């Protein structure tokens, strides 16, 4: 009878048992869970950055592509206008809703989260609060992709009330 130990399977020439198959399936599920956890950790770091001190150096390990470029430009524009965004965002209900491989071979994940913006304010160059009326909770849809070194970066973060992440 064949042993379930991998070394025995290789040396003994036995066919893999179902326990090897289930280990492979469990490994795949475990990898998917680890990737989802990494995505949430990246998002948690992103939303917890102090808005009045944020820099491109803070964003580069977390974001990629258009989202990184747009965020960097927004920081520069805000500083150029003399406005200051203070405080921090928080989030809840983060959930990965899709995972896969794009046609290019790049791995991706899609998630939704409820972004709480009540901890942030916008001040003009005189220090006057100019925060517009806004929804305190925002349903967000997010996408993360793997970059060249195999790590995950957030590539998209858009408001999407259809995902109902805050309900």
What does each of the following model-derived ranges do?
Residues 1-6:
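Sec-dependent N-terminal signal peptides
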Residues 61-165:
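Structured, amphipathic secondary-structure segments that form assembly/contact surfaces
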Residues 24-89:
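Core segments of small alpha/beta cavity-forming domains
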Residues 14-18:
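Bacterial signal peptide processing site
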